[in-house]
């Protein structure tokens, strides 16, 4: 079982332009994400998929493996599917390029189901929230997920799900962490499908899988790694990195 981490990276971003090259204490954001991915115990290879020559040049200088992709990809998963056609692998991880603090243990958690007797079509991570954490539950930028009794996703939404009409103290709300692992064939099938109705309504690419009958296994983690989507996120990550430096 050969696992490969693919990191989609584009230069333009709707909320924070050129964030992949943003400086994080002397190193570009995308380079820090790549270095964290290299620490995975289960993945044998890490590759960055980009349509930007500028990003590719920065990564080449660090010794990273890069695959150039088309600028027409509608989402990160389509970008890595294009790259995966040129790479030998049984399982491919889609690790967002804006995750410079990603825990290698979280990457391995997403991969572990594929080393079992009954590997899923796709796996992803979820983080339990307190029922009274209304800020995260109601934030449309924090995606929520509901699962069946076996831990497979029923639905992902930017809305608060489950709706809290009769919320019990024992009810757990789960936030989705956008790290995915796909079997090689499911990844290519995803890319061959057109964007789905619910995917476009919620702007959540994983709904394309659910609408087409694929099953997504959700693995619970207690480790939350802040990504970078806004200027405020960028400053928060800089503070975290700064506080971890010696001296």
Curated annotation (Swiss-Prot):
Its main location: cytoplasm. It catalyses: 3-deoxy-alpha-D-manno-oct-2-ulosonate + CTP = CMP-3-deoxy-beta-D-manno-octulosonate + diphosphate. It holds the Pfam family CTP_transf_3. CDD domains: CMP-KDO-Synthetase. It is an enzyme of class 2 (transferase). It is found in: Cytoplasm. GO terms for molecular function: 3-deoxy-manno-octulosonate cytidylyltransferase activity. This is 3-deoxy-manno-octulosonate cytidylyltransferase. The gene is kdsB.
